[in-house]
Curated annotation (Swiss-Prot):
Subunit structure: Homodimer.
Record has Cytoplasm as a keyword: yes
Species name: Bacillus atrophaeus
GO MF terms held by the record: thymidylate synthase activity
Pfam families: Thymidylat_synt (PF00303)
HAMAP family registered for this protein in UniProt: Thymidy_synth_bact (MF_00008)
Function: Catalyzes the reductive methylation of 2'-deoxyuridine-5'-monophosphate (dUMP) to 2'-deoxythymidine-5'-monophosphate (dTMP) while utilizing 5,10-methylenetetrahydrofolate (mTHF) as the methyl donor and reductant in the reaction, yielding dihydrofolate (DHF) as a by-product. This enzymatic reaction provides an intracellular de novo source of dTMP, an essential precursor for DNA biosynthesis.
CDD domains: TS_Pyrimidine_HMase
SUPFAM superfamilies: Thymidylate synthase/dCMP hydroxymethylase (SSF55831)
GO cellular component: cytosol
Keyword Cytoplasm assigned: yes
UniProt name for this protein: Thymidylate synthase
Chief location bin: cytoplasm
Length: 227
């Protein structure tokens, strides 16, 4: 049950999970929804209408998949197919919509997931077009492993392999000094993530259903966000 999270600095892991819930559970593009969770990491991209445009949760919430004669969104379709058609090679979600890229405040960094069920285990491969190694990468790698655990739990599978692919990993010049400090720090054993085993519906998870056990980490390091 080890979780891939940085130990050389403190990661705001609850903030990361709240952002995950905002995108995947609420399927929201409304920054005000995130603000209600006391999270402000998207404030810089907030548009006049309070949203980030047609990005992230907006794409997951579009009812563009057909299921039993009805239109459903990507998340509901994925959950249904994993339970009812586990051997499919089409367990994919996609945030990269070429028709709507110009309507997004920020084009998605993590844009695709592909899920595999083998021998009773749920495997996940994530694809990111771009990852800021100081800020975005630690959040994203942790978040999508949490997502894998959540979906494995509600679909009845054991946890399988987790693969995170990055097209362009980059370091901004202004982050170099603090990253050098971070690289010299002691690393600690990975903590364990507890997820409330009573939750059986993906939409019932709340932030209170997650606990990091024995999370030892270095001091906080500040990195400027690029807008």
């Amino acid at each position: 049950s080890e979780v891939p999270i940085l130990t050389t600095k403190k990661l705001a892991w609850k903030t990361a999970i709240k952002e995950l819930l905002w995108i995947w559970q609420l399927k929201s593009n409304d920054v005000n929804d995130l603000n209600k969770m006391s999270v402000h990491i998207w404030d810089q991209w907030k548009q006049e209408d309070g949203t980030i445009g047609h990005a992230y949760g907006f794409q997951l919430g579009k009812k563009n998949r057909s299921l039993n004669g009805e239109k459903v969104d990507q998340v509901d379709y994925l959950l249904h197919q994993l339970k009812n058609n586990p051997s499919s090679r089409r367990h994919i979600t996609m945030l990269w919509n070429p028709d709507e890229l110009d309507a997004m405040a920020l084009t998605p960094c993590v844009y695709e997931t592909q899920w595999y069920v083998k021998h009773g285990k749920l495997h996940l491969e994530v694809r990111a077009r771009s990852n800021d190694m100081a800020l975005g990468n630690p959040f994203n790698v942790f978040q999508y492993n949490v997502l894998q655990r959540m979906i494995a739990q509600v679909t009845g599978y054991e946890l399988g392999e987790y693969i995170f692919n990055i097209g362009d990993c980059h370091v901004y010049t202004r982050h170099i000094d603090n990253l050098k400090i971070q690289m010299e720090r002691e690393q600690f054993e990975a903590p364990e993530l507890w997820i409330n085993p009573e939750v059986k519906d993906f939409y019932d998870f709340t932030i209170d259903d997650f606990k990091l056990i024995n999370y030892k980490h270095g001091d906080k390091l500040l990195f400027e966000v690029r807008v």
